């Protein structure tokens, strides 16, 4: 699957600040977005949306593209033709008008200097290596900033496909292959040959609580199904 970078300047976009705030509060999707490199876009691809223009700038959304591109009227008064759009569904959204710290164009440029993170055409495709690196940077950033989810400055859907497998494996290895709640670990009991079985039973899951210093914790299925009110699973 491919990864595309979308740009949003609320100062000139038909998707205004007020529309964003309304969608953010209701946890609604923006619907669709325009793509400059539209030829190969398909359902299942990933998008990141970067806010540019005035005020705080940086990544404010990550999600999944839900359709191939289709031609429609220009969203701007310029009446350009043709303009191609694809439907998008947001998995993670951050309010740039809150106190949440964004993953800024400057930080992205320092890590991925071969892409213009400050603006330009929306809907540009990243190459595979750059897309994988961006995923690692993004989920590390989220992991280090859990308070924005507790403070309702951001929201996230707990989907099984939320974390890419390459990132998930690194998170599991980084903290050990056991559950961080109960310590459940196949390899510790049955030996290293069974380590791979943990992938089905232990995975990084997003939690929100004012006392937690990380967002993602390796949790087994049993602990993940603890009664509501006992844990802070992000829904």
Located regions from the model:
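Compositionally biased, charged N-terminal/linker segments
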Residues: 1-43, 109, 126-146
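Short, charged beta-turn/beta-strand-edge "cap" motif at the junction between a beta-strand
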Residues: 51-56
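Aromatic- and Lys/Arg-enriched surface recognition patch
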Residues: 58, 64-125
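Short conserved catalytic/interaction loops centered on acidic-Pro-aromatic/His motifs
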Residues: 73-75, 189-196, 226-235
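Short, charged surface segments at domain edges that flank catalytic/cofactor-binding sites
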Residues: 145-191, 206-212
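Histidine-centered catalytic micro-motifs used for acid/base chemistry in nuclease
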Residues: 198-205
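Polybasic, low-complexity binding patches
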Residues: 206-218, 225-235
